[in-house]
């Protein structure tokens, strides 16, 4: 009977750990750059669930990590929601009318993009 109880408790512990690990989300904090053959410029900075945009119609956005969306706001635009993706230092989103990849400063993807477009 003790063995069965121990096995059940161990199983519950493992399930709890797996569930908690899957809910853990990677921090998005940092500076994101738009890097292409024409430009290498700071696009926006994320701190927590908020971001400030350097250039463009929108001034800022709020991040909803559960839905993978952002809510763009600003004086020159009507608020709108856009889906985003984030993987390996690349934040892909439409903040200017066209979806672009933005690179987290000092990430491997950032350094690779700098090399690809001849900035390093």
Describe these PLM feature segments.
Residues 35-79:
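N-terminal glycine/threonine-rich, aromatic-flanked beta-hairpin/loop signature
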Residues 1-20:
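Sec-dependent bacterial lipoprotein signal peptides
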Residues 76-108:
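Structured, soluble extracytoplasmic/luminal domains of envelope-associated proteins
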Residues 4, 23-25, 88:
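N-terminal cationic leader/targeting segments used for protein routing and processing
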Residues 50-55, 92-95, 111-113:
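Short, well-ordered strand-loop elements centered on a beta-strand within folded domains, enriched
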Residues 60-67, 96-120:
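Edge beta-strand at a domain terminus
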Residues 19-33, 45-47:
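N-terminal helix-cap/turn-to-beta initiation motif at the start of protein domains
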């Amino acid at each position: 009977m003790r063995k069965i109880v121990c096995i059940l408790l161990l199983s519950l512990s493992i399930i709890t750990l797996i569930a908690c690990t899957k809910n853990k989300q990677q921090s998005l904090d940092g500076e994101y750059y738009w890097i292409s053959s024409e430009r290498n410029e700071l696009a926006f900075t994320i701190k927590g669930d908020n971001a400030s945009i350097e250039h463009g119609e929108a001034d800022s956005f709020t991040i909803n990590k559960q839905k993978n969306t952002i809510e763009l706001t600003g004086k020159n635009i009507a608020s709108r929601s856009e889906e985003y993706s984030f993987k390996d230092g690349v934040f892909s989103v439409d903040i200017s009318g066209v979806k672009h990849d933005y690179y987290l400063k000092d990430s491997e993807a950032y350094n690779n993009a700098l090399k690809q477009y001849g900035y390093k």
